[in-house]
């Protein structure tokens, strides 16, 4: 298979699954973590390698029979060169959209961890041919197998790093504070997205595209033991329960059959601590966009672009935590009537929103 974003949290866990089950790895890609990439090359011996930063390409220790590609264009060229029919897209951010589109254009199977592909480009992807690498959407897929049409889909959120932090203290929190997720070990961006609830908004949008319904809600479940629930028309409700470990969703997305233990079973006696809570829209204002984006899915491009600018500015110390939500809401208002007809328009709108957001952060709109 091909693993895009192999040095990140999803990528490294996917490689462990490949190693455990004897799956050969034809190609790897990464952004900047060349040291880890070189370790992966030595261990998995891929035929093709791609690095996003061309200036780092000389540091890649490719094997004699390997070929190296560079940049966003090189990544698409690498996909064309690969014979593997399975592509795991674990790239972070909007940069993952073009590879997702290319993967399906080539007729390859897409195991998708890149949320932004569906958030920004869901209308141009064949979602029936996507295997989601996400605990919530894997849970929904599991619960919906061979069942009648659901009444409502429910995904859960932990509440992120600041779930128990008083709202009055949020103005002063730092990136290091925000990166302390209570339950999951994830990359920096998704951990910040969890703290603002942007991640859950994105997952609602993913569920909209994957399962073809706008009857989607999210609740806070602080233990991260219950990942998804499905309510059926007859009044019954089922829940998907497992430990907070992405290897479960990864294994089901990349393997033909999963017939052995992947993660330790959940401690059922610990379920006594499970409680569900509404999402406080004053504390998590980004989530207030849920109904709007379910009605106008093209807004996903806008929300994602503004959020990426805000998150990375916060991580660099260029804005405050609350500025992320502020600028996302401002962009959603400014581009409320956005309409996207072609793939090219996605990239044009993305660029326009990023420029608006950067100006907004500087001007404190």
Swiss-Prot record:
Binding site for Mn(2+): 134, 136, 203
Matching SUPFAM superfamilies: 1-deoxy-D-xylulose-5-phosphate reductoisomerase, C-terminal domain, Glyceraldehyde-3-phosphate dehydrogenase-like, C-terminal domain, NAD(P)-binding Rossmann-fold domains
InterPro entries in UniProt: DXP_reductoisomerase (IPR003821), DXP_reductoisomerase_C (IPR013644), DXP_reductoisomerase_N (IPR013512), DXPR_C (IPR026877), DXPR_C_sf (IPR036169), NAD(P)-bd_dom_sf (IPR036291)
A GO BP entry: isopentenyl diphosphate biosynthetic process, methylerythritol 4-phosphate pathway involved in terpenoid biosynthetic process
Taxonomy, superkingdom: Bacteria
Annotated metabolic or biological route of this protein: Isoprenoid biosynthesis; isopentenyl diphosphate biosynthesis via DXP pathway; isopentenyl diphosphate from 1-deoxy-D-xylulose 5-phosphate: step 1/6
Cofactor field: Mg(2+); Mn(2+)
Keyword annotations from UniProtKB, A to Z: Isoprene biosynthesis, Manganese, Metal-binding, NADP, Oxidoreductase
GO molecular function: 1-deoxy-D-xylulose-5-phosphate reductoisomerase activity; manganese ion binding; NADPH binding
Family matches, as Pfam families: DXP_redisom_C, DXP_reductoisom, DXPR_C
Binding-site residues for NADPH, renumbered to this chain: 7-10, 31-33, 114, 116, 187
Binding site for 1-deoxy-D-xylulose 5-phosphate: 115, 135-136, 158, 181, 194, 199-200, 203
Keyword presence, Disulfide bond: no
Gene3D superfamilies from the UniProt entry: 1.10.1740.10, NAD(P)-binding Rossmann-like Domain
EC code: 1.1.1.267
Keyword Phosphoprotein: no
Catalytic activity line of the entry: 2-C-methyl-D-erythritol 4-phosphate + NADP(+) = 1-deoxy-D-xylulose 5-phosphate + NADPH + H(+)
Family to which the UniProt record says this protein belongs: Belongs to the DXR family.
Function text: Catalyzes the NADPH-dependent rearrangement and reduction of 1-deoxy-D-xylulose-5-phosphate (DXP) to 2-C-methyl-D-erythritol 4-phosphate (MEP).
Protein name: 1-deoxy-D-xylulose 5-phosphate reductoisomerase
Species in which this protein is naturally found: Campylobacter curvus (strain 525.92)
């Amino acid at each position: 298979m091909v693993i895009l974003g192999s040095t990140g949290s999803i990528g490294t866990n996917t490689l462990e699954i490949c190693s455990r089950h004897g799956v050969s790895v034809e190609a790897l890609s990464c952004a900047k973590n060349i040291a880890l990439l070189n370790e992966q090359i030595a261990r998995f011996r891929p035929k093709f390698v791609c690095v996003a930063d061309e200036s780092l390409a000389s540091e890649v220790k490719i094997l004699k029979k390997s070929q190296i590609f560079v940049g966003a264009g090189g990544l698409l060229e690498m996909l064309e060169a690969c014979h593997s029919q399975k592509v795991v897209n674990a790239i972070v951010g909007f940069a993952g959209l073009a590879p997702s589109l290319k993967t399906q254009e080539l007729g390859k199977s897409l195991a998708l961890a890149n949320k932004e592909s569906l958030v920004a480009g869901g209308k141009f992807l064949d979602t029936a041919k996507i295997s989601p690498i996400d605990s919530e959407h894997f849970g929904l897929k599991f619960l919906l197998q061979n069942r009648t049409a659901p009444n409502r889909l429910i995904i859960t959120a932990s509440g992120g790093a600041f779930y128990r932090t008083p709202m009055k203290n949020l103005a002063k929190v730092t990136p290091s504070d925000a990166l302390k997720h209570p339950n999951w070990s994830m990359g920096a961006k998704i951990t910040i997205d969890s703290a603002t609830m942007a991640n859950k908004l994105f997952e609602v949008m993913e569920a909209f595209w994957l399962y073809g319904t706008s009857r989607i809600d999210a609740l806070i479940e602080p233990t991260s033991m219950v990942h998804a629930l499905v309510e059926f028309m007859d009044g019954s409700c089922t829940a998907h329960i497992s430990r907070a470990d992405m290897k479960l969703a990864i294994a089901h997305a990349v393997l033909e059959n999963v017939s052995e233990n992947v993660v330790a079973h959940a401690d059922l006696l610990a379920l006594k601590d499970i409680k569900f809570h509404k999402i406080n829209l004053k504390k998590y204002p980004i989530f207030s966009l849920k109904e709007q984006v379910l009605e106008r899915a093209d807004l996903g491009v806008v929300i994602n672009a503004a959020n990426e600018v805000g998150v990375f500015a916060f991580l660099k110390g260029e804005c405050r935590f609350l500025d992320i939500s502020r600028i996302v809401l401002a962009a959603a208002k400014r581009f409320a009537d956005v309409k996207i007809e072609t793939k090219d328009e996605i990239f044009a709108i993305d660029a326009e929103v990023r420029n608006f957001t950067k100006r907004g952060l500087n001007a404190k709109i």
